Structures are given as C-alpha cells and as structure tokens.
From Swiss-Prot:
This is Alpha-1-antiproteinase 4. The record marks R23, T24 as: Reactive bond. Keywords: Acute phase, Glycoprotein, Protease inhibitor, Secreted, Serine protease inhibitor. Signal peptide: none annotated. Plasma. It comes from the Eukaryota. GO terms for molecular function: serine-type endopeptidase inhibitor activity. N-glycosylated with carbohydrates having biantennary side chains. One of its GO terms (biological process) is acute-phase response. It is found in: Secreted. The lineage of its organism: Eukaryota, Metazoa, Chordata, Craniata, Vertebrata.
Length: 43
C-alpha cells in the first residue's frame, strides 16, 4: 500500500510540474507575442 501511495504522489507531482512548465511557457509566449497581438488588434 505504501509503495502504491508513493507512486501516486510522484505521478501527481510530475503532472503539476508539467502544468507549471506549460503555464510558464504560455506566459512567456504571451509576453513575447504581446506586440504582435496588439498590432493585430490595433487595426
């Protein structure tokens, strides 16, 4: 039971790490793309 519980914890930790990485990537892309997005919406 302990082994299984540890495996589940590791899996959820890995998932949150990936979500964090994706979120960071998206935020970075938004910051980077803001001038382009603004120029598109400014038309």
């Amino acid at each position: 039971e302990d082994l299984q519980g540890t495996a589940v914890q590791e899996r959820s930790a890995k998932a949150s790490d990936e979500e964090e990485a994706i979120r960071t990537l998206l935020l970075t892309n938004v910051e980077f793309n803001r001038p382009f997005v603004l120029s598109i919406y400014d038309r």
